[in-house]
């Protein structure tokens, strides 16, 4: 859906050589961030103490993913877009998972570039508006 909307409206996805980079990071979110963080939430947040092996496994993999993201954000303002530093659909797909960092027992201070990026995206009015929906308001954790 993100790809379709970005292409249809010509926003949040590069049309130059950085397009492939954006799509690679989007696919990384779908193949790594989402599945692993989902499992981390299951074992660490919703069912703690039920499987020590699973808790340790997904905490370890979660931290590896944070390191990869932090290394990328050491070099660029946003996840993709190269040196232009544009906010893209890759950021949109990854950020909500990072917003739940407490559920997978991650301290964003341990990943300073991720934390900087997290706050940058949090400051966007559209992001705040999306999280403050009537009758389903959830605080964005900082």
Where does each model-flagged region fall?
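GST superfamily/GST-like fold recognition
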Residues: 32, 36-41, 79-110, 115, ...
